């Protein structure tokens, strides 16, 4: 335990927190170009074919991003918007693609949680 005099001289050092999305370089989102669109399988208790894309960001870093929702129109050279947010059962996937922006279309026939998937309000 430091004395008062030691605290006056040096002060306390604030704990540094490591960022969970280093490729975004402090931005909320970043634009990128798809270099590869493919499916991969999740970790042990789960079983599926998860849609992911390898994306080269405007910060010149290449990351793996998850494509949320049912169905997508992405292919190589598609321009996408990438946000942070990991996928728990896909190791190494720490980013998600924003649906309904740039080249990514929103999910069709989506009724609930539409804003998350870039789906427009259906005309009744």
Curated annotation (Swiss-Prot):
Keywords: Methylation, Ribonucleoprotein, Ribosomal protein, RNA-binding, rRNA-binding, tRNA-binding. SUPFAM superfamilies: Nucleic acid-binding proteins (SSF50249). Signal peptide: none annotated. Gene3D superfamilies: Nucleic acid-binding proteins (2.40.50.140). The modification 3-methylthioaspartic acid is found at residue 89. One of its GO terms (molecular function) is rRNA binding. Residues 1-32, 105-124 are annotated as: Disordered. Residues 9-18, 108-118 have a biased composition (Basic residues). One of its GO terms (cellular component) is small ribosomal subunit. GO terms for biological process: translation. InterPro entries: NA-bd_OB-fold, Ribosomal_uS12, Ribosomal_uS12_bac. Disulfide bonds: none annotated. CDD domains: Ribosomal_S12. Belongs to the universal ribosomal protein uS12 family. Part of the 30S ribosomal subunit. Contacts proteins S8 and S17. May interact with IF1 in the 30S initiation complex. With S4 and S5 plays an important role in translational accuracy. Interacts with and stabilizes bases of the 16S rRNA that are involved in tRNA selection in the A site and with the mRNA backbone. Located at the interface of the 30S and 50S subunits, it traverses the body of the 30S subunit contacting proteins on the other side and probably holding the rRNA structure together. The combined cluster of proteins S8, S12 and S17 appears to hold together the shoulder and platform of the 30S subunit. This is Small ribosomal subunit protein uS12. The lineage of its organism: Bacteria, Bacillati, Actinomycetota, Actinomycetes, Micromonosporales.
